[in-house]
Amino acid sequence: MSIIKKIINYSPNFNLKKRNLKQIKFIIFHYTGMKKEKDAIKKLTSLQSEVSSHYLVKNNGDIVVMVPDLYVAWHAGKSSWKNLRSLNINSIGIEISNPGHDHNYKSFSKKQILSILKLSKFLKKKYNIISKNFLGHSDIAPFRKK
């Protein structure tokens, strides 16, 4: 099943050591928080930013692969959930293009929502992720994110 358009814009911001895919237990949603989508892509693919995600859902609904699932992307940062710390290792990060609260927050587009649903269902099935393990960045880093 291929729901991802062949758009690949790899980020250099991930651990080179491959992980055991059975470790993946969470999906973490983020919004880019930048005025322009192209600036968000530039940041996510810049070595200096030290931030990335596995996927980016663009305004038009396209899904961009930023870091292959086999690698640990740097998206969760200093994070915790229940008894776990540093959730990068056991999660998939999905960035959603959106200016966020600091830049005139906008509702997600219908195309984005449909793509997010398709990608979420695909990843849930692929990695056997339970529904309560779909989280927002603000859930795992409440003092750093709104």
PLM ranges: what are they?
Residues 127-144:
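Acidic/histidine-rich, metal-coordinating catalytic segments
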Residues 2-128, 132:
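Active-site-adjacent loop/helix surface patches within enzyme catalytic domains
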Residues 88, 145-146:
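Charge-rich, low-complexity amphipathic helices
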